[in-house]
Amino acid sequence: MSHVSICLLSEAGADPGALSILADRWGLVSDDQAVMALVLTAERLELRKRDEPKLGGIYVDFVSGTQAHRRKFGGGRGEAVAKAVGIKKGYLPRVVDATAGLGRDAFVLAALGCQVQMLERNPVVAALLDDGLRRGYLDAEIGPWLRERLTLLHASSLTALVAIEPCPEVVYLDPMYPHRQKSALVKKEMRVFQSLVGADNDADGLLAPARALATKRVVVKRPDYAEPLAGVAAQAAVVTKSHRFDIYPSSVTPPR
């Protein structure tokens, strides 16, 4: 396992031994000079940009906040991502989210009833996801179904997509895409997140293995101004105000 250097901090009230366990599990090496910090608080794990403290911490929260509001009051099956993966009455596809990020769309699909496996290659992001899942699994309201439907695999999609079994009906891709200079007021969360992971410059290499794994379709989320992934025109798209969900058919030959 290659190691990632990041400042590791523990606040008052946090389990004093948890930080070293976290570092060992995810292959993290503490660097006091690093701009990015992974902070263990009494409640959760947070990512912070030390030179911009006003941005606050980034963390995964499936129980409260925007995710809970989206689950309770969002568009449900009418949400663009739900339409794009093909959810309809009597059909809930199994989904591999191959670029999980902070798990937002994966959680929406799981809340609607899909079995979703998240893949995340960055160990810091995987640690944040794992912490959010751990807290979510313990929640009395969402824990029982979350444990059944939403799981995490820390691996690179470029290699893992070849080996996943059983094959999902849908592979979902949402690679990090550079923001246009005009949109300087990128949400604070994205500024912190992009400082850590940067752009997914190898994302074009995901489309072919994703289409070879999915038995039905691949869905690629793109900003409205972005070209298609790998320059391959989509078969269809679900379009929102600022994004589109490009849809590609599986390249798997169905059995005769």
UniProtKB/Swiss-Prot annotation:
It is an enzyme of class 2 (transferase). It is found in: Cytoplasm. It catalyses: guanosine(1516) in 16S rRNA + S-adenosyl-L-methionine = N(2)-methylguanosine(1516) in 16S rRNA + S-adenosyl-L-homocysteine + H(+). Its EC number is 2.1.1.242. The keyword Cytoplasm applies. GO terms for cellular component: cytoplasm. One of its GO terms (molecular function) is rRNA (guanine-N2-)-methyltransferase activity. CDD domains: AdoMet_MTases. Specifically methylates the guanosine in position 1516 of 16S rRNA. Belongs to the methyltransferase superfamily. RsmJ family. This is Ribosomal RNA small subunit methyltransferase J.
